[in-house]
Amino acid sequence: MAIIKYKIEFFSNWHCSSGLAAGADVDTLVIKDDNNLPFIPGRTIKGLLRDAMREVIGYNDLTPEKINELFGYNNDKDSYYKKGCVSFTNATLDKSEINTIVKNNLSSFLYKSFTSTAIDENGIAKDSSLRSIETVVPRPLQNSLFKICSFHHIFVPLTFASDYRINFW
C-alpha cells in the first residue's frame, strides 16, 4: 500500500458544513474536531476529487472506468457497490499548528461569521431572510490518501473556481 500526501490551500474563507446551527447566532457551523479545530472529512475530499476527475475525462487517458476503479462504483438500480482502491483520511491543520493553537487556546481566531439578507426589488430586506454562516479563515489543510491499486500520472494540481487548490506529492 502506498501513501500519497496532499495539501489543500485556500485563497478565501471556506465552509464545510457540520449540519449544525448555533441557535440565533449562526445558522450554519463549520465541522470541527474535539479540539474545536476545522477539518474536512476524507469522504468529502474523495467526492470532490471524483467530481473534478469526471470534468477532465480524456486527459492523460483518464476514463470513466479508471475513475470507478479509483473511487468505487455505486449502482442504485441494481443495489451494487464496488469499493474503490483509494482511501482518504481527514484533511486537518498541520500538527505543529494544531499543537500551538490548542496549547494557547487560539481556535476562536480561525473562524469568521458572515451575515446576509435577501433584498426585494425595492431594496428592502425580505422578512425572515437574515442568515449567518460561520467560515474558516484561509489556512492550509493536509493529510494523506492511501492507494491499494496501481495508478499513475492522473493526480495533478487541481484548482477549483480559484478559491482553493489541492496539491499531491
Specify the residue positions occupied by each region the protein language model found.
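RNA-binding basic/glycine-rich loop and surface signature characteristic of RAMP-family CRISPR effectors
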Residues: M1-T117, G123-W169
